[in-house]
Curated annotation (Swiss-Prot):
GO terms for biological process: tRNA 5'-leader removal. Consists of a catalytic RNA component and at least 5 protein subunits. It comes from Methanococcus maripaludis (strain DSM 14266 / JCM 13030 / NBRC 101832 / S2 / LL). It catalyses: Endonucleolytic cleavage of RNA, removing 5'-extranucleotides from tRNA precursor. This is Ribonuclease P protein component 1. Belongs to the eukaryotic/archaeal RNase P protein component 1 family.
Amino acid sequence: MSQNILRHELIGLNLEVVKSTDSGLISTKGRVINETRNTLVLEKENGKEITLVKEISTFRIQFESENVVKIDIDGRLLVGRPEDRLKRKIKQLYSY
């Protein structure tokens, strides 16, 4: 599932920042409403939009299908245009 997230459409998913070099972004939550090569745009619960830089954060993404699944993903893996992520081979940042 975690490798499939890199090929998944992020717009419409709920997302939370769990780690970031910008401490003011940690715990920011919202729904992804737009994605560019280097950023994600979230709509927070109060209706405000916030732009997040992918490279400096780790995100907790929530999927809702038969049951709720939450996955933490390093933003560096998400850098790139959404359509190009489908074509790109996945580099492993961490060895498990």
